[in-house]
A protein has these predicted regions:
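N-terminal secretory signal peptides that target proteins for export/translocation
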Residues: 1-16
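N-terminal pre-domains immediately preceding structured catalytic cores
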Residues: 2, 33-259, 263-339
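Alpha-helical and His/Cys-centered functional microenvironments
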Residues: 9, 23, 146
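Enrichment for repetitive, rod-forming helical segments
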Residues: 9-13, 26, 267
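Residue-identity detector for glycine
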Residues: 18-21, 57
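Bacterial N-terminal signal peptides
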Residues: 21-32
């Protein structure tokens, strides 16, 4: 599939680690010694990929799960499409109830972003994508927003389910990347994991509170935001952030390259399996994945794509306000280098 972002499977088995990690947004070379990967304490995990926990039931690192190709999803019939739209409308109401950090998007802006989403999908040979949810992120410095979209058939326009502020890569500091642009597939080939909720040396819970899910999109080419620029491999993830110190900063660029989201949005995407189509296919094949909690209310319309664009908007819209004046005062020294 031309132009689609490709990831490198450089982490066949990621060991568990005890101290708080941060999002992996720089290149790292893992050297195996006698067939055994280096342990976390042998590497600076604050500048590399945070390892997944080990499945306590099987003893098998979650990252070794083999992906299963989901069954192809045929176009929905008129009756099924109408049912899907009703489900989407119900999920929109659920989003309003469950996600505390929300943005109110004007109708014309909803439409414009839906058009931009379709254009980006078409550029990556996904023009016909329909019948599933898609996550869209605008990394523009003046916007910093995430949108969840759905359409039942390729003949429908993309419909907004909900929007929330994010924080993407802030250039200008060593090891900080611009959040990469493109269409990224959320697949068990880069297995998700969950936050330990412990603090790093700067007093920051880089992945948020305990049990927050880290959506791992693998190794991608990232544009360096320091020095002379250029590109390097970076580990691209979407995850929650410190709820006490950094979540209030959502709405401005503040990460090392990954997409930071609110805890309530993290839980919403997780609980309803918004981008878990490939994970659910793996479960349907008979695999048990510790990263998927029991009791989830997974939508039958789960998708698998996170799309990142840059609208290059010059001014900040009223619907995407800046964080409050006191937000930066809550960040401890060194807190702005934690992802």
């Amino acid at each position: 599939m031309k132009n689609r972002q490709k990831t490198l499977a450089l982490l066949p088995a990621r060991p568990a680690f005890g101290r708080a990690g941060v999002c992996a947004c720089v290149a790292v070379l893992l050297i195996a010694c006698a067939g055994n990967p280096l342990h976390a304490e042998q590497l600076d995990w604050e500048a590399s990929a945070a390892p997944a926990s080990v499945d306590a039931g099987s003893g098998e690192p979650a990252s070794t799960a083999a992906a299963v190709t989901p069954p192809s999803r045929p176009p929905l019939s008129a009756e099924d499409a109408a049912s899907a739209m009703r489900r989407a409308a119900a999920l929109r109401q659920t989003f309003t109830r469950e996600v505390t950090r929300r943005l109110t998007i004007p109708a014309d802006v909803q439409h414009a972003y839906g058009v931009r989403l379709q254009q980006t999908l078409a550029e990556h040979d996904l023009a016909g994508l329909a019948g599933e949810y898609v996550v869209l992120v605008d990394r523009a410095a003046t916007v910093q927003a995430l949108f969840i979209y759905f359409r039942a058939t390729r003949g429908n326009a993309w419909t907004l389910i909900g929007a929330s502020p994010v924080a993407t890569g802030l250039p200008g500091t060593y090891d900080h990347f611009l959040t990469p642009l493109g269409v990224f597939e959320h697949t068990p080939g880069n297995m998700d994991f969950r936050a330990e909720g412990t603090m790093n040396q700067n007093g920051i819970r880089g992945y948020g509170r305990h049990d927050m899910r880290i959506y791992d999109l693998g190794w991608v080419d990232g544009e360096r935001g320091w020095g002379k620029g250029g590109t390097s491999k970076m580990r691209f993830q979407m995850h929650a952030t410190d709820p006490d110190r950094l979540e209030s900063l959502l709405g401005i660029r503040h990460s090392k390259g990954c997409v930071r989201i609110a805890a309530s949005l993290n839980e919403f995407i997780d609980r309803h399996g918004i981008i878990d189509a490939d994970y659910e296919a793996l479960v349907a094949s008979g695999r048990s994945l510790w990263v998927l909690h029991p009791g989830r209310e997974v939508t039958p319309l789960a998708g698998r794509y996170i799309v990142v664009i840059d609208s290059q908007r010059k001014t900040r819209p009223a619907w995407s306000p800046l964080p409050g004046r006191t937000a930066l005062k809550q960040v401890p020294k060194g807190g702005d280098v934690a992802d």
